[in-house]
């Protein structure tokens, strides 16, 4: 499988376990645990053979944590997920279908099906279309194009980093 999944966590506990359980075991998962919790690292790596938990020396935030994980990706594609994301069974397959239709893509992101976010369009049959930016809860990357952008700007610790990244990736593929 040509995909590595990166999840940045900070004491996400049971939520993180639910996320990992929703991911096909064939895919390697890098968890960046920003709380530097060695017990969680041991727990994750004992429970899930496909999980490697990395403990940075300090809390790197969302962008820095993702950069650490993405710098270790050796596959052509990476999927970053927030720890509270639960993937539907066909989610990864759908990312690859979209990637095959748009081979020069930079970032592909799903539509949130969480009804409490009323700003989102909940039409489940949306075609892939180019947008200026996406929400950072789940982003599927073409690593070739992402590497050209130098990943996330670590000056953004927790908010707006995905908007900045989207702007830079979009400028590279046009």
What function would you assign to each model-found segment?
Residues 85-120:
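Conserved donor NDP-sugar-binding/catalytic core segment of glycosyltransferases
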Residues 22, 33-42:
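A conserved acidic beta->alpha catalytic loop
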Residues 7-25:
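Short, well-formed alpha-helical segments that are part of the catalytic scaffolds
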Residues 27-36, 54-56:
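Short beta-strand/loop segment that forms part of the nucleotide-sugar
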Residues 2-4, 28, 164:
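Cell-envelope/extracellular polymer assembly enzymes that use nucleotide-activated donors
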Residues 78:
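Short aromatic/hydrophobic "clamp" motif used to bind/position activated sugar donors
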Residues 139-141, 145-151, 155-174:
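A short, conserved alpha-helix in the catalytic core of glycosyltransferases
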Residues 56-73:
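Glycine-rich, basic loop-to-helix element that forms the pyrophosphate-binding segment
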């Amino acid at each position: 499988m040509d995909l590595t999944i990166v999840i940045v966590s900070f004491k996400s506990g049971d939520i993180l376990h639910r996320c990992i359980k929703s991911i096909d075991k064939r895919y390697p998962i890098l968890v960046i645990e920003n709380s530097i919790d060695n017990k969680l690292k041991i727990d994750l790596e004992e429970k899930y053979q496909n999980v490697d938990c990395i403990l940075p020396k300090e809390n790197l935030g969302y962008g820095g944590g993702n950069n650490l994980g993405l710098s270790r990706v050796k596959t052509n594609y990476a999927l970053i997920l927030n720890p509270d994301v639960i993937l539907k069974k066909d989610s990864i397959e759908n990312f690859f279908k979209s990637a095959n239709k748009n081979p020069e893509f930079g970032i592909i992101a799903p539509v949130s099906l969480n009804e409490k976010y009323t700003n989102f369009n909940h039409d489940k049959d949306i075609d892939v279309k180019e947008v200026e930016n996406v929400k950072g809860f789940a982003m599927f990357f073409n690593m070739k194009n992402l590497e050209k952008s130098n990943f996330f700007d670590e000056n953004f610790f927790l908010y707006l980093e995905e908007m900045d990244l989207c702007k830079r990736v979009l400028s590279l593929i046009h």
